[in-house]
Amino acid sequence: MIQKKSKCSDYIRRVFYTLLGQKRFRKLLAFSLKSRYKSSSVCFPVNIEQVKEILIILPEERLEVLHQLKNVISLVKHFKHATVTIVCERSASSYIKMIPGLNVIEYEFQENVAIPVLLVKEVKKLNHIDICFLLHNNPSLPLRYLAGVSEADTRVGYDGAGGFPFLNLQIRPDTTKRYFADWNCSIAKLFGALPDEIHWSVAQKTIDEVNHLLKELNIEKKSYLVGLDIVFLLNHFGNSWTETLVNNIAQLELGQLYFYVSENPSVSCVEWIQKQKVPFIGDLSASRTAALVSRSNLIISGNTPIYALAGLLKKHAIGFFKEDEIEMYCPQTSTLMGISYKTATEEIIAQTMSLIANHNKKRKT
């Protein structure tokens, strides 16, 4: 794993980046990369059988990584004869490591760093890269630069993700696909990879660790677990609305409620949570969060990693989505249910309770 390092050279690069500004620095990086490539053209379609080395660059955010998993797995299956290396931010690397047979280069995200020097060194250690996939719709400058400096014959990304010399093949996603994970798979489809259902599971060791954590909270192993992404609810709907929802759910006596506390809750959120008579589980690693979702029977959240994990692990979940989000991020399946909202209203609580009641009725039949 690549660790953060405080060096004089890093400081100088940050100062230089700040003085020039992102737009000028991008032009400077593009100019420095153009000398590596004789032509901006690319040979397509690619001869799949001749591909030996693939580099996949993933987004920095956990949620974006989860939305790319279907794409990644489709590509890995399609290029099963090739060596696949994934570049992934450390906090999300556990998700990728659950896919067997991959080389993973981890790094820690740093703001205001235009040239990922340590990442470049790691990529340079690889054999000649045939294809570099930049799987990000709006990649940061460091990730664009990494794709450019990979010197891959084919450097592919989404339309608008970066022109030559960073990328030499840009894909316009299939506009008939509304669900984001399927929309992302436009790249896999272009190369002949057929997106498949994700069969994803959490290591038993990690599940055992979470079971031990639940035991410490006096939650029985066989409890029917209902997890509320409490920080999301408080931030989007406020204390009063959230408290009403929690009380209504508690009255149903579904099973054991718990609060999932995501990263960096505000002081006011922490104070509110501590006043409630509900056990809470704080900021878990990516793998333990997946294990917690795996152990849960119902998740209530929104457009968040925990909701995306519920979808991947085929767990029941109810999500709150803004009107411009629900079609893209909630597929509305037998397990994933979504509610569209503008503001916190009693009607949304009523809709939520109706979905929970239907879910409870089905599980008892």
For every predicted segment, state its role.
Residues I2, S6, D10, G157-Y158, ...:
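Nucleotide-sugar donor-binding patch of glycosyltransferase catalytic domains
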Residues K52-T175, R288:
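Active-site and donor-binding regions of nucleotide-sugar-utilizing enzymes
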Residues S91-S93, P139, P265-S266, P305-I306, ...:
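Alpha-helix capping/helix-boundary segments
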Residues G160-N235:
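Mid-sequence helix-capping/hinge segment at a functional interface
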Residues I2-E49:
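Positively charged, low-complexity intrinsically disordered leader regions
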Residues K52-E64, S201-S268, E323:
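Active-site donor-nucleotide binding/catalytic segment of nucleotide-sugar enzymes
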Residues P116-E122, N127, S240-I318, K322:
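Donor-binding and catalytic core of enzymes assembling or modifying cell-surface/extracellular glycoconjugates
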Residues R24-L28, S32-R36, V42-P45, N264-I273, ...:
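Extended, non-globular alpha-helical segments
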